[in-house]
Amino acid sequence: MKDIFNFFEKPKDPLSFSAIRISLASPDKIRQWSHGEVKKPETINYRTFKPERDGLFCAKIFGPVKDYECNCGKYKRMKHRGVVCEKCGVEVIQSKVRRERLGHITLATPVAHIWFLKSLPSRIGNLLDITLKDLEKVLYCESYIVIDPKETTLQRGELLSEDRYHKSMEEFGEEAFLAGMGGEAVLELLKVVGPADKGHGEGVHGLADELRAQMKEATSDAKRKKIAKRLKVVEAFVQSGNKPDWMMLEVIPVIPPDLRPLVPLDGGRFATSDLNDLYRRVINRNNRLKRLQELNAPDIIIRNEKRMLQEAVDALFDNGRRGKTITGPNKRPLKSLSDMLKGKQGRFRQNLLGKRVDYSGRSVIVVGPELKLHQCGLPKIMALELFKPFIYNKLEEKGYVTTIKSAKKMVEKERPEVWDILDEVIREHPVLLNRAPTLHRLGIQAFEPVLIEGKAIQLHPLVCTAFNADFDGDQMAVHVPLSIEAQMEARVLMMSTNNILSPAHGKPIIVPSQDIVLGIYYMTRERAFARGEGKVFASEEEVRAAYDQGEVDLQAKIWVRLDGKRVETTVGRVLLYDIVPKRLPFESINKVMDKKQLQNLIDLTYRLCGEKETVLLADRVRSMGYGNATRAGISIALENMIIPRKKQELLERAMGEVDDIQTQYTEGLITIGERYNKVIDIWAQVTEEVAQEMMSQIGQETAIGTGKDGKREERKQPSFNPIYIMADSGARGSAQQIRQLAGMRGLMAKPSGEIIETPITANFREGLNVLQYFISTHGARKGLADTALKTANSGYLTRRLVDVAQDAIITEYDCGAMDGITLGALVEGGEIIEPMGERILGRVALDDIHDPFASSVLVKANEEIDESKVKLIENAGIDKVKIRSVLTCQARRGICVECYGRDLARGRKVNIGEAVGVIAAQSIGEPGTQLTMRTFHIGGAASRRAEQSTIENRNPGLVKFHNVAVAKKKDGTLIVMNRNGEIIVTDDQGRERERYGVVYGAKLLVRDGQKIETSTLLAEWDPYSMPIITEVAGHVKYGDLVDGVTISEQVDEITGLARKAVIASKDPDARPRISIKDDQGKTRKLANSEADARYMLPEGANLVVNDGDEVDAGDVIAKMPRETTKTKDITGGLPRVAELFEARKPKEHAVISEIDGVVAFGKDTKGKRKVVITPEVDGKLRPDLAKEYLIGKGKHISVHTGDRVRAGEALMDGAANPHDILRVLGEKELARWLVDEVQEVYRLQGVKINDKHIETIVRQMLRRVRIVDVGDTNFLADEQVEKFVFEEENDKVITAGGRPAQGEPLLLGITKASLSTESFISASSFQETTKVLTEAAISGKVDHLRGLKENVIMGRLIPAGTGLPHYKHLDIEVETPVDAVEEAEEALAVASGEE
C-alpha cells in the first residue's frame, strides 16, 4: 500500500489505486513527512513581505514563494533548478510545493489528541479503563496517576490527589512507586497497556485475550456490555497494528502554508486563515514551556503551561469540543482543522462532492413553442462563449487563422465567418440543461442547441413537468459535454427524447399540460346544433376539406367511414386522428380528451409504436393544442362563476341541524367532543353538497337551436363555461378552487391545526366579510411558513435516502433467490385502492402462475409480468401472486436484474450497472418537495371527509362472516363483539369480491349467508366514540368507581348537566371496572369461557349506565371518545415518511402479542394491567408457554378475555412499532408494513411511486444483523454486522467444524444505516465526520471504493452504468469485410441522391 503523502507526487491516473486506508500516524511518520521544524510563531515580515525563517511560512521548510527563486534573490530562473541556496537555505524549485510540503512542531510534553480523548466513547479512556472525567483530571494537571506501583499496595492507573500523592511518598518512600501527571503519564500508561496482572510487555494482544476470558465469566448483562465495548476498541488496535501510544501527540504536523494563506490587504493589514492563529498559539505556548523547563521553574507554573499547551492543541484540532471556544479578534470562533472537514461548507460537501464546473452558463428561460422535443434554443452570445475552444480549433483547421491568439481576436470581433463556424460546431453537439433544485435525474437533460437571437434560453414546453419549470422568471444552467464519450452518453442516455417515462412510476412524464390540454380538449368536445351536424363523410380527407371550406364546425357531430366501418364522431376528433400513429385504434381518441386521456394516449403509443413515434406524436399534439387553444379564445369573466341557486336553502338546513345538535348537547345527551365532531361533519357535508350543486350547474347547460325538422328544440349538454372547461380538462384549477370561487369556502383550520367550527359560507365572488377574511389568513400564512420549512426538511430526507441507497447497484443477472413476496390488491375500507395488476406489472414471477380454472401456465417462473400477462392474470381471477423482490434478493453486493424487474424509465428489464438505489431515493424524495410546496394552493381550506360510519357493498353476491363474534340483543339486532371480524362478499362462483373489516361494537344489518344486491348497508357504528359492550345480561355493579377518586362528575359549563368520566387515580391498586351480576348478586360468567363478566375502564371513558341498572347483552356500558379530528395534510405526511424511514419508535406504541393464543387478564402490578396470552397446542391450552404483557393503566386495552389473538396483533390502541413487527413477524411482514405505510402518505396526495423504490430503501435498512450468540466466530456479542459478512464467517466456521454465530435481523433508520456503511469516506462525508474518522483511524479501516460517493470524492468514475469496472477492460474488435464497406458506400450514395 502506498503512503498517502507520496500522493503529493500526484498519481496521474486516479484509477492507479484500488483502496484507501486510514490509520494513526506515529511520531516518526510525522517527522518523516516533515521538511523541517517550525520553531517560531512569526509569519511574514510586515515590511518586506518575505516569510520569516523558521516561522510558519518559512521558505526553507516549505519551499520558495516565487517559482524558481530563492528567498534572498541569489538564484533566479530555471537554470538553477534543484540548488539549495547557501545563504538562505531555500531550495530553488516551483512554488507550488508550498501546497504539499508539511512541517512539524516538536512538543515539549506529549498531549492527547482530542478526537481520541473526547469523541464518545473516549478511546484512550476505554483502553486504560479510566473514566473520561478522571482522564481529564490527569491530562489537565489536576491529579497524579500511578504508572507503576512496583511493590506498593497502590494499583496501576489509580488516581492520587496532591495530598494523597505526598502522603504516599512519605509512606512508601520516593523510589517505591512511579506516578505522574499530564500527557507524559498517560503516554507511559498507553505504552505499557496490557493485562492487569502481568504488568508490561503483552500489549494489546494480551489485553484482548484477558477481556475475552472475562467476557466468558461475566454474569450480569451490564458488565458484559461494558467489556464488549472495551474489547471492541482493543480488537481494533490488535487488527490494525496501530500502537495505543500514538493517540498521544509528541509531534504535531503543520499543514502546507498555501492551504492556510496569509493575504496582504490594502492599508497594511492582512487577511489570514484561522489556522495560522491556532498554530501560533501552540508554538508560543510550546516555546514558553521549553524555556520554563530550562529555567527549572516552579512545578505549578510548568503545570499551568502544560495545561495551556494541551488546550491550544485541542483548539487546533477541534475548536470548541472542550472548554471555551477560542475566538478571534472579532468574537468569531476560529475554524479548526475539524471544522474544515465538517458540514455543508466543509471539504467533503463543498469541494469534493460538488464542484463548480467550467463550460457552463445560465440564463432565464422562455417557452419555445416551435422547438422539436430534442431541441432547446441557445442564445448566440452564450453559444459563442461556451464553444470557444471548438471554434478556435475549427478556425485553425479551416485556415482562417494560424495562432490561437489571432483566433481569439477574430472571435472577439464577431466576424461573419465565426458565426458560420459556430453553426457547424454546435450541429449535433448536445448540451445539458439543468434547473435547480435537481430533485431527480430528469432535472438534467440533454438537448441539441438551436441558435437564437436574444438572451433567454428557449425550453420545449413538454419537458417543463420533468424540470418542474415555469416561465415566471426561472433560470436554467447550460453545460457542455466536452469529450466524445460524454457527448455520446448525453445523446444516448440523457436526451430528452430518451426520457419519456418517469423513473418513479413508469408512466409518461412528457405529458401535455395547460394550454395544450385545453386546445385538444376543446377540439374533441361536441357541441349541440353545430354547423354540419349529422353529415356523413366517406373519409378523413373529405372531413378535412369540408372543415377547411367552413362547411362543418370543429365540434359538430358527424358520421365518417374509417377502416371500413361507419363511426359516429366529431370533426375535431377526426383531425386529431390524423396526427396519431395509425397503429392506434380510433377508439383511443374518439372521446373527450382531457389530460388523463392524453397521458394514456402517450403511454399507449409508447407501448405499441415505440419511442420515435411517441416523440413525433408529442410534438404534433403540442402544435395542434396551442393552435386550437388560440382559436378557442377561452377567457374568464366574473359571470362564469355561477353561484348555485340552492345554496341559501342548503345553508339554512345546515344551520338548523347545528342548532339541533346544540340542543342535544345542552340537554346532556352528547359530550362536547361529539358535539364538535358532529358539527364539523355537518358543515363538511354541506360544503360538499354546495360544491356538487355548483358543479352540476356550471357543468351543464341547455343548448337551443333548430332541430332536424326545422323546429326549435332544447338539448342538455356539458357546458362550455370557460372555468368549467379549464378544470374539467385538467388544464388549470380544480373543483376545489372553483368551489371557493363560486360555492362556499367551507371549513378553515386554526394555526394549531384544529378546525374552526363556523365555516366561511361566502365565496370569493360574493366576497368575504372581515371575520371571514381574518379566518382565511391563518391558512394562507401557515401555508407559506410551512412551505419554507418543509422544503428544507424534504431536501434533507432526500439526502439521507440517497446516502443510504447509493451503493444499491444492479450487479448481476440472477442471484438465484428461492424466495419472494406475495402481492395482492391493496384494499382499504373495503375499497380496492390499487389493483393487483398495477402492483405486479414489470415484476418477475417467482413460481409458475397457473390458471385456477384451466390447467394452463399463464406466466412461467422467472418471467417478467408485462401488460399482456397482467391482463391474463386478472381475467383468470387470481388474487395473489408470488413475485421476486429486491427485499429477498440474495446478491451479496448490490441487487440482481431478476429481483428488480423492469426499469420503469425504459419499459424493459433493468440493465446491469443501473444505480437503482439513487433512483429509488430520488423517486421518494422528489414528490416530498413537491408536496411541501403544494399546501398553500388551497389556502388552508380544511379538507376532511365525513367520518366513515357504515359499510356498503359494491358488488351483488352472498355475505359470509369471517371470524365475527356477535351478541344478539332482545330486539334481534346483532352487535359485533370482537375486533378482527371481516365481512366477505362472494360472487356466484364463490370467488371473493370484497372484504371489509368490521369495527368492535358495530351493528350488523345483514345475516351470514344472505344474498344481497349492490349498495346494501351491511353494518353501521358510531364514528365518534369507541364503545365498551357487555356480552351478558344482568345488573350493573360499579367496582372501585369512587366519586372524586377514580371518577369525576364533570359538570358541563354550558349545559349544567353532570356526566361521569373515569380519571387517573392516585391509588395504584384502584381498578375501575363494571361487573355484571345476576339476580343473586353473583358475577355472571362469559358465554364461552370461565372468565367473569368484568369490564375494566380506561381513563377518559364516559359511563353510560348507572349502578344497579339492568342491561341486555350487546348494550353499551361506557364510551371512549375518539380524538377530535385534525386535518390530514402532508404536513403530517413528510415527518411521517421521515419517521418511518428512520425506524423511530413511536411515543405511545402499541404492545403487540408475540404468539397466537387466547387472552386472559392477570393480577395488576405496579399500577399496570397484566395481559396473559396462552397458546393452544393441538387444541389444548399450554399455560407453561404463556406470554405476559404489562400495559399502563390509562391505556385502552383493545382485547377482551377469551379473544383469540394472532402473533403481531396489537393488544392496545397506539401506533405500531416497526422493531416489534420485525421481531415478531419477520422481515417480509415488516417490509410490507413499511411499504404500505409510506405509500399511504403519498397516496393521500395523489402521488404515484412504484413499490420497488420503497423496497430498495427498506432493503438497505435491513442489511445488518445483531449477534445474539457468538458461537466460535470472531464476532463480539451485540455487535452489528452486514448480513453477507455474517453468513461468510458462519460458513467458514461450519466448514472448520465449529459452532456458528446466531444473529437476529436488525432494522436501522436511514441515518444510522448510512453511517454504518462499509466505506468510511462515504460515512464521513454524510454526518458526524469526526466521529466516523476517529473510529476508522483506530481500526485502520480500508475503503475499497465500491459505492458511488467514495468514488466521486476520490475523483474517479462511479462504478455504475458506463463506469462499471468490467467495461473498463473491454476491447472492441471490429471486423469489416471489404464488401460491407462497398455496400455502405453505395447505400450512402443512394440516400444522398434521394434527399
From Swiss-Prot:
**Annotated Zn(2+) 1 binding sites:** 70, 72, 85, 88
Pfam families in UniProt: RNA_pol_Rpb1_1, RNA_pol_Rpb1_2, RNA_pol_Rpb1_3, RNA_pol_Rpb1_4, RNA_pol_Rpb1_5
Which GO terms are recorded in the biological process aspect for this UniProt protein?
DNA-templated transcription
Q: What is the required cofactor set for this protein?
A: Mg(2+); Zn(2+)
The Enzyme Commission number assigned here is: 2.7.7.6
Residue positions annotated to bind Mg(2+) are: 470, 472, 474
Cofactor note, please?
Binds 1 Mg(2+) ion per subunit.
**What does the entry list under GO cellular component?**
DNA-directed RNA polymerase complex
Function, as annotated: DNA-dependent RNA polymerase catalyzes the transcription of DNA into RNA using the four ribonucleoside triphosphates as substrates.
Record-linked HAMAP family:
RNApol_bact_RpoC
Oligomeric and partner information: The RNAP catalytic core consists of 2 alpha, 1 beta, 1 beta' and 1 omega subunit. When a sigma factor is associated with the core the holoenzyme is formed, which can initiate transcription.
Record's family? Belongs to the RNA polymerase beta' chain family.
Q: What is this protein called?
A: DNA-directed RNA polymerase subunit beta'
Q: Which gene encodes it?
A: rpoC
